[in-house]
């Protein structure tokens, strides 16, 4: 490496250290999904960035979904995937696909990209995600809601400087497996671990005043403003539960939560290094 290249690298590393100082030896929970998970090039970049953060002393917990793979598996059974109010209807065949694809294929493919630093887990392991059947006006089948997060296994992995990669399957006290919303899992784990930051990767630019115009991005929202934005219809539909996960985390003591655009290369690093990506939620 030439002298000027060494100097440039040293300067970049110094700048990165300044931005990462608030997160040194702290926990960041990343909910990973959307286009960044489907696009193979973006997927590799995300895993590279998480590896870099790990090497720089940030403790990253990765929570992932796997909607497209699950839908593909359901279609192979001759069924059409069903969704009501944004939640997947999960019958017995579908939960079997979830276990096979989400906790199996998808999880292990991500772990492999972390080059020996990842450890693949699902919520069933060591009763990490204890849940019960979701009670709603609609019967969603094997869809669960979390009643307790057991952090022992996660803490063990983090203390060994490993990156937990968690698929969003939980288990009830009878040993029945349930599919759980990934944003909810990420938020609950972040709260249970006392994480400093929650990051949710999406397929949109962030919270928009006009959902058809990305130039109307709202870069920052103080949590007390959220209800007003709901009343105005700016936060609507699937963004309501996603943002609720962010505000729950912050109100429980988290420093900040980001909804970021996963279509942007190095989206996680951009959000941590002071760049403009997505919407930041915080509390005064």
From Swiss-Prot:
GO terms for molecular function: acetylglutamate kinase activity; ATP binding. Keywords: Amino-acid biosynthesis, Arginine biosynthesis, ATP-binding, Cytoplasm, Kinase, Nucleotide-binding, Transferase. Substrate binds at residues 66-67, 88, 179. GO terms for biological process: arginine biosynthetic process via ornithine; L-arginine biosynthetic process. The keyword Kinase applies. It is found in: Cytoplasm. One of its GO terms (cellular component) is cytoplasm. The keyword ATP-binding applies. Pathway: Amino-acid biosynthesis; L-arginine biosynthesis; N(2)-acetyl-L-ornithine from L-glutamate: step 2/4. It catalyses: N-acetyl-L-glutamate + ATP = N-acetyl-L-glutamyl 5-phosphate + ADP. Its EC number is 2.7.2.8. The record marks 31, 242 as: Transition state stabilizer. Its main location: cytoplasm. Catalyzes the ATP-dependent phosphorylation of N-acetyl-L-glutamate. HAMAP family: ArgB. Belongs to the acetylglutamate kinase family. ArgB subfamily. This is Acetylglutamate kinase. It comes from Actinobacillus pleuropneumoniae serotype 7 (strain AP76). The gene is argB.
């Amino acid at each position: 490496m030439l002298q000027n290249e060494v100097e440039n690298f040293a300067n970049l590393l110094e700048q990165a250290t300044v931005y990462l100082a608030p997160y040194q030896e702290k926990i960041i929970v990343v909910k990973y999904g959307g286009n960044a998970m489907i696009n193979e090039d973006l997927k590799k970049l995300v895993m590279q960035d998480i590896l870099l953060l790990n090497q720089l002393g940030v403790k990253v917990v990765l929570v992932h979904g796997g909607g497209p793979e699950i839908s593909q598996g359901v279609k192979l059974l001759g069924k059409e995937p069903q969704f009501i109010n944004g939640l997947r209807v999960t019958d017995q065949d579908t939960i079997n696909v979830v276990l096979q694809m989400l906790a199996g294929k998808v999880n292990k493919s991500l772990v492999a990209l972390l080059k020996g630093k990842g450890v693949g887990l699902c919520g069933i392991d060591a009763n990490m995600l204890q849940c019960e059947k979701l009670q709603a006006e609609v019967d969603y089948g094997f869809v669960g809601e979390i009643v307790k997060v057991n952090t022992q296994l996660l803490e063990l992995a983090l203390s060994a400087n490993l990156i937990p990669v968690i698929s969003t399957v939980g288990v009830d006290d009878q040993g029945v497996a349930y599919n759980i919303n990934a944003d909810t899992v990420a938020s609950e784990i972040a709260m249970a671990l006392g994480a400093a930051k929650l990051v949710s990767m999406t397929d949109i630019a962030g919270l928009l005043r006009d959902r058809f115009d990305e130039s109307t991005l709202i870069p920052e929202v103080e949590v007390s403003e959220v209800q007003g934005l709901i009343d105005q219809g700016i936060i609507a539909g699937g963004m309501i539960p996603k943002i609720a996960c962010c505000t729950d985390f912050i109100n429980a003591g988290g420093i900040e939560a980001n909804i970021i655009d996963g279509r942007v290369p190095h989206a996680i690093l951009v959000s941590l290094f002071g760049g403009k990506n997505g919407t930041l939620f915080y509390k005064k």
